[in-house]
Swiss-Prot record:
This is Protein mono-ADP-ribosyltransferase PARP10. SUPFAM superfamilies: ADP-ribosylation (SSF56399). It is found in: Cytoplasm; Nucleus. It comes from the Eukaryota. It is an enzyme of class 2 (transferase). Residues 755-960 form the PARP catalytic domain. A motif (Ubiquitin-interacting) lies at residues 604-621. Residues 555-570 have a biased composition (Basic and acidic residues). Keywords: ADP-ribosylation, Cytoplasm, DNA damage, DNA repair, Glycosyltransferase, NAD, Nucleotidyltransferase, Nucleus, Phosphoprotein, Transferase. One of its GO terms (molecular function) is NAD+-protein-glutamate ADP-ribosyltransferase activity. The modification ADP-ribosyl glutamic acid is found at E103, E831. Residues 325-341 have a biased composition (Polar residues). Its EC number is 2.4.2.-.
Length: 960
């Protein structure tokens, strides 16, 4: 369908199998009956299919028509997803066809159609005579048509098999699950875009006979996105495959498609309706029993003060369904699931059990006595697998339901703060706030009618709340606002402007470091000793000058006026002469000394400087060498810290964002200005003198990102502004970086966005290559390890040469990074020898600057936007990763890589994945698979050290 005009394809659902294809085409080509027009094609898929109109306007009219009926059956239509180019459907398979036979048959069809043989995979199917085959290379619509023609001519085990294209799927199916997956937990997980890549669901149902669980999404893009990721839930890896109704057994498919999608479902069926307004994701309705009368539910809202003893909420198994904000539902098959409902709906107080011992109740903010907060989320409650001891008694009761409304965290707090009395007045409904990282909102328990009325009331209240995003212009605002002082500031503004601030978006703008750890820049304070040494040099120059003046005085040292005393006298040289005249009667006797103390001062200064220079030239040269080495080490450490602590500008584009919920009447500009003024009052400044040296722009930019400060150049000084201790830390860091002058002709070592290597670019200190002798032990070790990981391509790769990569500065930074990981990392080993294939043009850059992300990572971003390394060289020698040059030579680096603790990688990552949901601590690297990782992705430039460069080439067939 890539050639089909946009909007011309419609998806047809609810089609009984007895309606022939000819009737379908005639009906939708009849302009008077259906509003349609000429059809290009009709692709039938089970109890539905895809209509492709020649004119998109015809498809638009068909959609606009209120109803379509054939043989008394109401048909459902909606825009169709585009064709899936890497997927084909095979139907009319003979019984007992194995997946291997099916894959071999598809490969035979590809060969017969003139296509190169490619890897294909037959996916698990609930129906034996239909199967879906996933291809490794996409096919065009014309190529699929040619393949379908070959399928009619080439039988499979004596049976004629039909082949057809399928659209992108809207549904996925969970198969091969080792243990049953909790359906409510699965639903919440797949609705969470951050956790699973999913989104709003259209329905969720279990197929009979352990054929799998079908999850339908409202958007096909979401389903396809979910299929591209790996999924883990409760320690179990989920196996997800595309799902179409045509793959289901005929009786089941007819039952699903034949129902009226607008009808109310029976108890025990789960489905989804479109998302409502006001930030609601829908309401979950559960028909359950209860041990108390509905009138007693209101007592939950009037429970005792904060911290009063509570009672854990047990879990019960019951019938589940999803109800939209307008009450519409979608029918699907019965399933079983679990959720929470209080065993006893009454006062939550308990004399014998304290609130600290209860797993499900917690404290709420001051002034929220009417609302009992839940610790964790609905997902956490389900994961605990609690069982209700009162289940049998509850089954005797009828008419009570439970609803879960998904609401943004800021909106929940706003309702709790400013509508407390109104919420507490709901007599017949128990209202529980859900405040967690995955699900936030309200749980309503009670009779159906009061719960629906309470739901409508909450929707109305949510409609009166406006949500705005405020951008923080000051560096370090996110870190400050998440601290104690920042929280106090936000609370004061909330009380002043009747609003609620949400800090959930601030965590991504802060550094992924532990804020409680020791300041790493304290080690750089050795610079103070260097400054003291300069002062001592100045004092020694004064001593030499005094000694020379004393030796040249005709009256000796006792009559000589010290130079310091002359400077301290208020008068000029004239006053000095008058005092000497009063003490000594003979003026002529004093004229010569006076002339010596004034006219010869410049000569005396020159002699003192010369004598000091002669003296210093006689000192040991080792002291100078030691000082230079210490300065180099100090600056190398500062550079390493600058890279290791670089701020991760992910999700917010490097700018912190604060979410605010308030009423529509509130002036948001006034609120934003008040917040900006309050932040200005907490800013601190530090000044660092450049001492006549230049500050490279790249250095200043990295320093700002590293310490969350702003650096402004004012004459010969740099003014650092930020919050808390950050300006002081940045000042220490900058002082260490300015120990020696920067060579302005060299690119900044950590900034290689525009690499510019001259002829001496591979000389020290940037890096150099040194060829290894083939008979050396080092050469043999590198070659042996390389060949042992080539796997199937072992006999097709020949090594041309091996070179050692030397880069002292990068090695120092790497060692510092390694020592830091050795102390904090739990995974062992921390360090691994990996391979990195690259192009010829990138070799010089890597040798000079290491594995910098600005010119690495161009070949793939499937597991993150970092630098990729392979555990086995067989992956690195592929032409995709190490393209050969004009002479056929390929470049593969051997590298020591600090993989540390690694997490699951995913597309779009600009930093390692978070360790724990809701915290800012991250893993050290990302991998393709947690169980057996083959690919590692790093995000710090000092995390990998190139040790050897292997130049190799492919051996052509027949080459000796």
């Amino acid at each position: 369908m890539a050639e089909v005009e946009a909007g011309a394809a419609l998806e047809l659902r609810g089609l009984p199998p007895e309606i022939p294809d000819e009737l379908i085409t005639l009906y939708f080509e009849n302009h008077r009956r259906s509003g349609g027009g000429l059809l290009l094609s009709w692709q039938r898929l089970g109890c539905g299919g895809v209509l492709i109109f020649q004119d998109p306007a015809d498809a638009k009219r068909v959609l606009a028509q209120a109803e379509h009926r054939l043989h008394g059956v109401r048909l459902s239509l909606r825009p169709a997803p585009p064709r899936a180019p890497e997927r084909v459907l095979l139907q009319h398979l003979p019984p007992g066809t194995s997946p291997l036979s099916l894959e071999q048959h598809v490969q035979a069809l590809l060969g017969a159609a003139g296509h190169p043989v490619q890897t294909c995979h037959a996916l698990a199917s609930p129906r034996q005579d239909c199967a879906l085959v996933q291809l490794s290379t996409p096919l065009s619509e014309a190529e699929v048509s040619a393949l379908a023609e070959q399928a009619r001519n080439l039988p499979l085990n004596g049976a004629t098999v039909s082949l057809a294209w399928v659209p992108q799927t809207r549904a996925v199916r969970v198969v091969d699950s080792a243990s049953p997956v909790d359906l409510l937990l699965l639903e919440l997980y797949l609705e969470n875009e951050r956790r699973s890549g999913g989104g709003p669901l259209e329905g969720l149902r279990s197929l009979p006979g352990q054929l799998g669980t079908v999850i339908s999404f409202q958007q096909w893009q979401v389903a396809e996105r979910v299929l591209k990721q790996k999924h883990w839930l409760q320690g179990i890896e989920l196996s997800l495959v595309p799902h179409y109704d045509v793959l289901e057994p005929e009786a089941l498919a007819e039952g699903v498609s034949g129902r009226d999608h607008s009808a109310t479902q029976e108890s025990g069926v789960i489905g989804h309706a479109p998302t409502g307004t006001g930030g609601l994701a829908g309401a979950l309705t559960m028909a359950v029993g209860s041990g108390e009368a509905p009138q007693q539910l209101g007592t939950l809202l009037r429970a005792g003060p904060v911290g009063a003893p509570g009672q854990a909420l047990p879990v019960d198994s019951g019938s589940i369904r999803i109800q939209g904000s307008m009450g519409s539902t979608s029918p699907v098959d019965p399933v079983e699931s679990s959720t929470e409902l209080p065993e006893q709906v009454g006062p939550m107080a308990s004399d014998s059990v304290g609130v600290q011992e209860q797993e499900g109740l917690g404290e709420v903010a001051t002034g929220q006595e009417g609302l009992m907060g839940l610790v964790g989320t609905a997902m956490e409650s389900v994961e605990t697998g609690l069982e209700s001891p009162g289940y049998g008694e509850m089954q005797k009761q009828e008419g009570l339901v439970e609803m879960v409304m998904s609401v943004e965290p800021g909106a929940v707090r706003y309702l709790q703060l400013y509508y407390e009395d109104l919420l507490a007045s709901l007599e017949d409904v128990a209202l529980f706030p859900l405040e967690g990282t995955d699900v936030t909102g309200f749980r309503l328990c009670g009779a159906r009618a009061p719960c629906q009325a309470a739901q409508e009331l909450l929707q109305s209240l949510l409609g009166s709340i406006s949500c705005h995003t405020l951008n923080m212009k000051h560096p370090g605002s996110a870190r400050f606002l998440l601290g104690v002082e920042g929280q106090h500031l936000l609370h004061r503004l909330e009380a002043q402007f009747q609003c609620v601030f949400g800090t959930e978006h601030l965590a991504s703008a802060t550094l992924d470091i532990d804020p409680e750890r020791t300041d790493p820049t304290e080690a750089l304070q050795v610079l103070h000793g260097h400054i003291t040494g300069i002062d001592q040099e100045s004092l020694r120059l004064e001593d030499v000058r005094e000694l020379l003046a004393t030796l040249e005085s005709p009256h000796g040292g006792e009559d000589r006026v010290p130079l310091e005393m002359e400077k301290e006298k208020p008068g000029g040289p004239g006053e000095t002469v008058v005092e000497q005249q009063e003490e000594i009667p003979t003026l002529e006797a004093e004229e010569e000394p006076v002339a010596l103390s004034t006219g010869a001062r410049g000569q005396l200064e020159e002699e003192a400087t010369l004598q000091l220079a002669i003296h210093r030239s006689l000192e040991s040269q080792s002291q100078v060498a030691d000082q230079q080495e210490a300065n180099a080490l100090r600056r190398a450490m500062a550079l390493s810290l600058l890279e290791a602590e670089e701020a991760l500008d992910e999700d917010t584009g490097g700018e912190a964002q604060l979410v605010v919920h308030t009423s529509f009447e509130q002036d948001v500009d006034e609120l934003n200005q008040a917040l900006s003024n309050a932040l200005e009052a907490h800013l601190r400044e530090e000044t660092v003198s450049l001492q006549g040296r230049m500050l490279p722009p790249e250095l200043g930019a990295r320093l700002e990102r590293c310490h969350d400060v702003s650096a402004t150049l004012r004459g010969d000084r740099v003014v650092l502004r930020g919050f808390g201790v950050q300006p002081a830390r940045a000042a220490r860091h900058l002082a260490a970086l300015l120990v020696d002058p920067w060579d302005q002709n060299l690119t900044f070592p950590l900034e290689a966005s525009k690499p510019n290597l001259s002829e001496q670019g591979l000389k020290e200190p940037l890096g150099r290559l040194e060829a290894l002798e083939e008979n050396s032990q080092e050469f043999q070790d590198v070659v042996r390890a390389f060949y042992s990981t080539l796997d199937a391509v072992h006999g097709r790769i020949r090594i041309v040469r091996v070179e050692r990569v030397s880069h002292p500065l990068l090695q120092q930074q790497y060692q510092l990074h390694r020592e830091r990981l050795m102390q904090s990392c739990q995974q062992r080993p921390v360090e691994q020898v990996l391979y990195h294939g690259t192009s010829e043009s990138a070799v010089l850059d890597i040798c000079a600057h290491g594995f910098n992300r600005s010119f690495c990572g161009r070949n793939g971003t499937l597991y993150g936007q970092g630098v990729y390394f392979a555990k086995r060289a067989s992956l690195s020698v592929l032409d995709r990763y190490s393209p050969p040059n004009a002479e056929g030579y390929k470049a593969v680096f051997v590298a020591q890589v600090l993989t540390g603790d690694y997490g699951q990688g995913s597309r779009g990552l600009k930093a390692p994945p978070l360790r724990v949901s809701g915290q800012v601590l991250r893993y050290d690297s990302a991998v393709d698979c947690l169980q057996q990782p083959r690919i590692f992705v790093i995000f710090h430039d000092t995390q990998a050290l190139p040790t050897h460069l292997i130049t190799c080439k492919n051996i052509l067939p027949g080459t000796p």
